[in-house]
Structure formats: structure tokens, C-alpha cells
């Protein structure tokens, strides 16, 4: 039995500390939707998504009412479209994205992920077509998200793909110049991408996954901050233990909701992603958790150590609360989506270089960072390459979701609204890296990849 104190504590977390389920994401396999005729394949994709996810939003709303826990987003991830579309006669995969968008709109989800390709070791014909289609697809759809995996610890980094993605990010920004480059906010470049990630924009349904599955992403920076403030002045062991216990409680709630959703929908439960995911709302910030640990401002010296402690304690607590942990599982640092990070970047303390250092110890990478619109494709590729190298060498997922905001320069800001928030334009290095990123080929896998 639960004690009255535990019940009241959970109510307080929801009402006062912004505790919520960030997303219930249904993963759907589209491998049986392939067809030589592109139009038929698109129709099959639409039909399968609208059939499998017909009751997803309804189930989420019922669980919200039953348990009193806010579920912010209901989303869908699908098999990487490069795999499904490759057998078709299409030389542009935008119609596949449009079919996904229509299906997402029909079932009422706010995002659908999986306009994706896995090219860490090289390209197939379908991979090239999909990557070439990304700018148009993201500019002409509302709910579709795209991701491309360009590196892994086992295979090294496909630098041809890195350079091409620098160009694609630039094209995405230019196609949505009237919206501050919004298409870039729906595109992620990965190293060591997880196949069961419930969070956007990097979600897709991996080829080793079941026909259909429910994955859950939790959110609780406000809860962790409140707990950290209660142990002010204690030693690091006490601090870590406090975060660990708090993460346990948050993850338990995620597991409960995920299993309830899976049961209602008649599909298997997949994983809980332990990630602390901030929002632009006051009191829902990862940066403020780090500041509660004793930093004057997120981004100052000591930030990386504080984030390492936070990330590790979240994983340890969450792993005890669920048998099935997956996705990214750690602390997110999306600049435009975190009120504390926005503030730190505006005063110049949180820089691109510091964010890169922080990605060495957190769950993902350079996320939702706005940079000057005149940044070249080669510089974008070099930024991506740096981040991929961190992931490759350290056996971890890293990613880049970066926005070269058209017509904007340092001192300006971009406004996306909603969960995507807003961000100041931060500077990049002016020295180029064109000769390096255009060498071509693969950066070999590191020696530590030889594990067998």
C-alpha cells in the first residue's frame, strides 16, 4: 500500500513542480508497406498508421483522467522511410512524408518521426533519395520529423554523410526562412542512434522492434530541482542519492502510464526513457537544477561536472524503477527549450563550446541551438563532425539539431513558440574547416570498438 504522504507528494509534483509524462510514442513497423508503386506504398503507410494509432490519443486522454497525470504529447514513430520507400519507383520521397503528415493529422498526434536514414557506413540508393528529399519534405509538412545516423562506435563516421547533412541543414533553413528556419528544428543528425527513442525529432521505429510498441518519455526537471534545493550544503554523496531517489519516483510513474497505455491499446510495452526533458516554462529547466547544485549560472566552470553527476544519478534511480529502460535516458540540454539555458546564453556565459563539453556527459548532444544565418554548410558539417566524434569515441549517443537562422546574426533571436521555445543567436568560430570536411570517406572506428 502507498502511504498518504506518497500520494500527496505525487500530487504536489504534478501541481507545483511541472511533473508530467512528456510523450507516449507508438512505434509502428511499416516494413510490410513497401511497394514498387510509390503511390500504393504511400496509401499503405497512411492506412496502417491510421489503423494502428486510431485510439492512441483517446487512450492517452483516458489515462490522464484516470490517474490525474498530465500527458503532454501523443506521438508516432515509424520504420525509417529510406528502407520502406527504396523498393518503389520514386526519385523523391516527399510524397511519403506527406502521407505520414496526413496520417498524423488524422489520428491527432502532434509529431510523427521516422523520415529517416541510417548511413553510418555508407549510402544505398534509397538513403540518398531520402536525404535529398529532407528539405522539401520538412518545409511542406507540419508534423513530420527527420533523423539521419551518420556514425557509430562500431563503424566510425561517414564523413560524406556529415558533409551532405551540413548542406541539408542549410537548405532546410533557407526553405523556411520566413519561420526562422523552423524545418531545422525537425531534423536531427545522430551518432549511435537508439532505435526505441520516444522523443522528437529523433524518434524512429527500429528494425529490431516488434510490429507495434508503446514507448514513454518522462519529464521532471522541476521535481529534481525542488529535491536538490532541500539538500543545500550537503556533500556530493547526499546530493547524488537525492537525485537518484527522485528519478526513481519519476520513472515509476512513467512505467505505470506506459503499461496502462499498452494494455488499453493491446500492444506490447517497450521502454521508459529516463531523460529529464525541460520546457520553456519557468521551473521546468535542467539548467536551474545545475544552478541549484551551487553554480551561479549554467555554463560557468563546474557545469560539466554538475551535469555528469545529474545524468548518472538519474540513470541509477531510473534503472531501479523499471526493467525496461531505453531511448536516450539522461538529461537533455536543448537550448531553446530551457528557460535557464536561454538566460545563460543571453548573458554570454553558456557558449557553443561549453555546450559541446556538456554533451560528453549528458544523454544527447547539441540541441536546438540557433546560430547566425550566414554560417556555411562546411562549418555546419564541422560542428556535426565534432559532435559525432564525441559519441563515437565514448560509446554514447550524440546528436546535432542546429538552426542557422536566415537573416539573423549574433544578438538577434529566433521564436518558434510552444515546446520549441525561443533562443538567442550564439556565435560560431570564424575560421573555416572546408578542406577537412570535404576530404571524403570514413573516419575509422576507434580501437575501443573492438570488443569481441
Curated annotation (Swiss-Prot):
InterPro entries named in the record: UPF0210 (IPR007841)
Pfam families per UniProt: DUF711 (PF05167)
CDD domains referenced in this protein's UniProt entry, alphabetically: RNR_PFL_like_DUF711
Cystine pairs: none
Similarity remark: Belongs to the UPF0210 family.
Subunit structure: Homodimer.
Protein name: UPF0210 protein Dred_1672
Organism: Desulforamulus reducens (strain ATCC BAA-1160 / DSM 100696 / MI-1) (Desulfotomaculum reducens)
